[in-house]
Amino acid sequence: MMKSMNDVVLDSHAILRFAQDEAGADRVAALLSDAEKGNIRAFVNEINLGEIYYITMRRMGADFARRFLDHFSTLPVERVAASWEIVVSAAEMKAQYPLSYADCFAVATALKYRSVIVTGDPEFKKVEHLVKIDWV
């Protein structure tokens, strides 16, 4: 029986694992392959991309961070801008749950696009009742 596929929002945690070829990178790669084939849509909020950029810059240097963002822009991932609707949703999430503000943007994006969040960040356990989580 074929598993039904869901659209996904890639959280910074999952993308960083992919960038650094850590545990869970293969799952992210498989989702990107599914997105390339048109089986699913993959999203990332631009706030989370900014988070990825500064973390990658700190850990691996500016050159690597820039190269990774350049490479990431070629992947089948739709960037989602922080529209007013998403900003308000993220702010409401932040007011109610002890999540980082950037994580709230991932949740707001998943709610807007009715998508599953792909992450390994245990902080998301606090909102499992609101959105589906694909743990990597």
Question: Model-found features: residue ranges?
Answer:
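Anion (oxyanion) recognition and catalysis
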Residues: 36, 73, 111
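Helix-loop "lid/cap" segments that line or gate small-molecule binding pockets
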Residues: 55-56, 76
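Acidic, PIN/NYN-like endoribonuclease modules and their adjacent C-terminal/linker elements
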Residues: 1-7, 107-136
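Active-site neighborhoods of divalent-metal-dependent phosphate/nucleic-acid chemistry enzymes
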Residues: 78-118
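Acidic active-site catalytic centers that drive phospho-/nucleotidyl reactions
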Residues: 11, 51, 103, 121
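Short, well-structured N-terminal submotif of metal-dependent ribonuclease cores
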Residues: 1-44, 57-70, 134-136
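Alpha-helix capping/helix-boundary segments
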Residues: 14-15, 48, 86, 106, ...
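Amphipathic alpha-helical segments within well-ordered protein domains
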Residues: 16, 50-53, 91
